[in-house]
Amino acid sequence: MGGIKEFLKHEASGGILLMIATVAALLCQNTFLSDFYNEFLKTKFTVSFGEYELSKPMILWVNDGLMAVFFFLIGLELKREVLEGELKNPSQIALPAIGAAGGLIVPAVIFYLFTKHDSFALGGWAIPTATDIAFALGILSLLGPRVPTSLKIFLMTLAIVDDLCAIVIIALFYTSELNAQMLAVASVCLAALFALNRLGVKSKAAYLIVGAVMWVAVLKSGVHATLAGVVAAFFIPLSFKDEPGKSMLKSIEHDLHGWVAFGVLPIFAFVNAGISLRGVGLDEILSPVALGTALGLFVGKQIGVFGFSFLAIKFKLAKLPEGSNFIQLYGIALLCGVGFTMSLFVNGLAYNDTDAFAYTDKLAILLGSVVSGAAGFILLKFSAKN
């Protein structure tokens, strides 16, 4: 339980910082600071390795680089949870897994219904399927002990399954033209990581160097670079035969949690949440992409997560989290509609980080997430009083 409590503590307080970063980005984009803010996002940074040079604007360093660290942490959490955590026991994973399935299917269907006549817009079908665990737990932290720990663990486990689905979606649907040479380099790195794991190598630096080379290769291959972080994490040893009490995975996970919660995600929010509200009217807000996104998050997520979970409990496929009731479960389902950073990330992949929809796609993510978060907070607070 200690690892779970630490996870909840970091994610919850990090969620509050995410809110501050979001407000800061909106203020920068919609005040006299807008020119400075946009120039900052376009500022190019170059890293050279002998003949090789990697030059990208700030926003792509964040989206491709820092977010790879975030997905690396997700990979570590997934591996630990599968081997010895909440995902090890099929009975414990049943309800969050079924809820996550509903939270994936229903929002995607809603988005499809609004955008089916526009093939480019339809490419964003996965945007409302995501859940921002940091933001959701940040909202839960404001309720303190009013919410049972079992529900917090349910939300955390559902978000982990949700992240796993996001990884698969990115790999299958948001991969551009492939570079065979770079994929070959990435494969060699993969083999090297496997060898390091099997040989019981205890040097974090060795894994870091091979992982960094693999990240560059994947970045150049056409596969999204964040997937390199996930794959690398799967080869970090959970324990060593000669030192069973020592865990490299848990050590790295512990060290990274703070950096990701208080650094990576707030920075990502700051560079991606700068939505221009100038000229945004009712027509833009009621556009197919905006409606599909906002309603997918607010309506689709709550119906999908709660509906599938309710049926699973009624058909005795799973049990209601200990010490909770259906009203509280519905409140958690509402919080799952807080897609924010993950939805913004998928949005960037779907529409190639362009402003093809004049920021209304991002505005819809913000609106859907805020309404979901507010509704979930109010319902959970009300249910605690009763």
Give the ranges of each region predicted by the language model.
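C-terminal ends of transmembrane helices
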Residues: G2-K5, L73-K88, L137-P148, A191-K202, ...
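Predominantly late transmembrane helices and immediately cytosolic-facing juxtamembrane segments
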Residues: E6-H10, L27, S203-V213, A217, ...
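Hydrophobic transmembrane alpha-helices of secondary-active transporters
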Residues: E51, S55-E84, F234-I236, V260-V280, ...
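Entry/N-cap segments of selected transmembrane alpha helices
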Residues: V82-A108, N179-V188, L277-I303, F326-Y330, ...
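Transmembrane alpha-helix boundary signature
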Residues: C28-E39, K56-I59, L73-K88, V106-A126
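Structural signature of hydrophobic alpha-helical transmembrane segments
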Residues: I59-F71, S119-A134, T175-A191, H224-A232, ...
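Functional cores that coordinate and move charged inorganic groups
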Residues: L140, G144-P237
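Hydrophobic core segments of alpha-helical transmembrane domains in multi-pass membrane transport
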Residues: L18-Q29, F70-L76, V106-F111, C189-A195, ...
